[in-house]
Amino acid sequence: KNVVLFNTVQVPHYNYVGDSVLGYKAHMGAGSITSNVKSDKKLVVVKSPEGQIETGIKKFGAMLGDEVEVGCGTVLNPGSVVGSHSNIYPLSSVRGFVPANSIYKKQGEVVEKY
């Protein structure tokens, strides 16, 4: 719903993707979702290395760069940004910004890809 999907995006297995942008060849593992409304119903804020960006809207999911791999059962919280060529481990709960060429492990640990 209200999604921009670039070429060859894969959202194949029991996913919910709302109010989000998924880059070229991004892949959502089985059961992974983009949460697009905050639990407190406040406006969504996108966080970046440069600071916070006020969206001014209540519904905003996630932005995934090109060739991002999202593991099974992952929740991408409202306003999450995942840089190109990054991997998200299964069963993660992602908040905020994940740099390009990174691996997001459980509990928010982010390491650079080799």
Walk through the language-model features, giving the residues of each.
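Glycine-rich hexapeptide-repeat left-handed beta-helix
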Residues: 2-114
